[in-house]
Regions:
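A short beta-loop-alpha structural element at the N-terminal edge
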Residues: 21-35
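Active-site rim helix/loop that mediates acceptor-substrate recognition in acyltransferases
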Residues: 54-76
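Conserved beta-hairpin
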Residues: 73-90
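Conserved acyl-donor/pantetheine-binding loop and adjacent beta-alpha core of acyl/acetyltransferases
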Residues: 87-149, 205
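Conserved GNAT acetyl-CoA-binding A-motif
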Residues: 141-143, 170-183
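Conserved acetyl-CoA-binding loop-helix of GNAT-fold acetyltransferases
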Residues: 147-150, 156-169
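Conserved active-site alpha-helix within GNAT-family acetyltransferase domains
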Residues: 161, 173-175, 184-201
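C-terminal "cap" of GNAT-fold acetyltransferases
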Residues: 176, 180-185, 204-223
Length: 223
């Protein structure tokens, strides 16, 4: 990722998030975020595939914790409050995927010890597929919603909108495309509500998992 992007765009986005009254996550919070995400992934097809078809709470938690640690310097990671009822992770334009060595040195070895070496292969297979689609639709010139997770007991209380709207307004102001993918059909309608269009729907090759690639064009009327 371009160092200039990290130096300028990421701090600018964080200022917008703070101005909206949201909480910029600190490194000390990453374990709690991983717990929130792992709980939300109990019925998520992709994570079940990562762990050979059966939900594994510890594996999901480790995947998220290692991923968040790896991208801390590059990402905009924020929550609704310090209570962390929900959080979002955005990566700026130029992101092409997590690097293997930082992933391993930030806790990936613990994931291997827990789940076996095969899980790294499945993670790489998915990320390669997902990043190729992102490049196809945005040429990597996008703000990428890597994760949006809400505690189950906090769902339906407007937290998703609280997290999404300031960043989407920022994308509109900057005339930037927003990109995301989901592997659960029920989520497609949620993201359409925020202005995302479904660009591709297909089964990931050699897996039972569906993939939904979505793009949101900047809305000039919001500027």
């Amino acid at each position: 990722m371009d160092k200039l992007v990290r130096k300028i765009e990421v701090p600018l986005a964080k200022k917008i998030i703070e101005k909206a009254g949201l909480y910029i996550v600190q490194k000390k919070d990453l374990a709690r975020l991983a717990e929130v995400a792992a709980d939300a992934y109990q019925d998520y097809p992709l994570h079940n595939w990562f762990t050979k078809g059966k939900y594994d709470a510890k594996a999901s938690r480790l995947i998220m914790q290692v991923s968040l640690k790896t991208m801390t310097e590059d990402a905009v990671i924020y929550a609704d409050s310090e209570e962390i009822n929900g959080f979002a992770v955005w990566l700026p334009f130029g992101f092409t995927g997590s690097k293997t060595i930082p992933f391993l040195t930030n806790g990936g070895l613990s994931l291997i010890f827990h789940s076996g070496l095969g899980i790294i292969g499945r993670l790489l297979t998915y990320e390669t597929y997902a990043m190729n689609l992102k490049k196809e639709f945005t040429d990597n010139y996008d703000w990428y919603l890597y994760n949006l997770s809400i505690k189950k007991e906090a769902q339906g209380k407007g937290i998703a909108s609280k997290l999404m709207r300031p960043m989407l307004q920022f994308c509109d102001d900057e005339r930037m495309v927003a990109y995301l993918e989901t592997n659960k059909e029920a989520n497609v309608g949620l993201y359409r509500h925020y202005g995302f269009d479904l660009m591709k729907e297909e089964q990931i090759p050699k897996t039972p998992v569906m993939h939904y690639a979505m793009v949101r064009q900047p809305n000039p009327t919001n500027v």
